[in-house]
Amino acid sequence: MMADHKSVTRMLKTARGQIDGILRMVEEDRYCVDISTQLMATQALIARINADVLKAHIEGCVASAVESGDEELKAAKLAEIERVVDKLAK
């Protein structure tokens, strides 16, 4: 993975902390809108992490495949990205 490992790890630990906090909120029967707000914040953070990882993949693995001149490898990497984009669009 070409993404900044420290940054990705830090953000994932932040997301884990947010989820732990949300679990406590549910256990404490906190106000639903407050829980929903925290859930949306966590979803946004996870989406950002995913975008960073995918960007690094495109800049690293996909770019290398394109530059390699290997048409089969290039097609495989582009198909891989298409599948991910399709999943994100759902």
Predicted regions and their residues:
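Solvent-exposed interaction patches of small proteins and small membrane subunits
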Residues: 1-90
